[in-house]
Amino acid sequence: MWARLSPEIRQYLLITSNYWAFTLTDGALRMLVVLHFHQLGYSPLQVAMLFLFYEVFGVITNLVGGWLGARIGLNKTMNIGLAMQVAALAMLLVPASMLTVVWVMAAQALSGIAKDLNKMSAKSSIKLLVPEGADAALYRWVAALTGSKNALKGVGFFMGGVLLTWIGFRNAVLAMAVALAVIWVMSLLLLKRDLGKIMSPN
């Protein structure tokens, strides 16, 4: 069935799968961090501080992400985003004694960069895959991708709470890191190379 699909549809499905998997784990991670560190006795201000770098570095990445995608290719920015999210999750697998506010803030900074790289790459890639002049199709494809964001975030929040209850913080983070690493490897193998890259003139 996969082989019968057009290359554009295959790329669209791959990009959408990347985006959905990332959004789910991103939402779950945020809920895990809030609940876990609240359980450890962190004050509301300390918990809020954990996400400061997430937002700041996300804004910075949003400003330079388009330029970076044009320079190195959207496939690379998407794969870098996935890899950085795996790294951010791995940072939270250290012993509990090392999970200081500063350490978790650094992990969240990586996650914030990863989020905006992934989001920018997904949206821009979809626009390139739709044939020129097919504005209605472009609207539907982008709407299907981005319209699912809030719903997936909500599912991710719920998933984070459930995972924390069922298997605990460390195992939940490990499970998400492994799942996202599998998605990352598939993306490395299957995502079109030089997607969105501005080619240098000879």
Task: Please name every model-derived segment.
Residues 2-56:
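Helix-loop boundary and gating motifs at the non-cytosolic
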Residues 61-74, 164:
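Helix-to-loop junctions at the C-terminal end of transmembrane segments
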Residues 83-98:
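C-terminal ends and interior cores of transmembrane alpha-helices
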Residues 55-63, 153-154, 158:
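Residue-level signature of mid-helix packing/kink "hotspots" within the transmembrane helices
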Residues 188-202:
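Flexible cytoplasmic inter-helical loops of multi-pass small-molecule transporters
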Residues 107-149:
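Cytoplasmic helix-loop-helix junction between adjacent transmembrane helices
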Residues 171-189:
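Symmetry-related core transmembrane helices of the 12-TM Major Facilitator Superfamily/SLC fold
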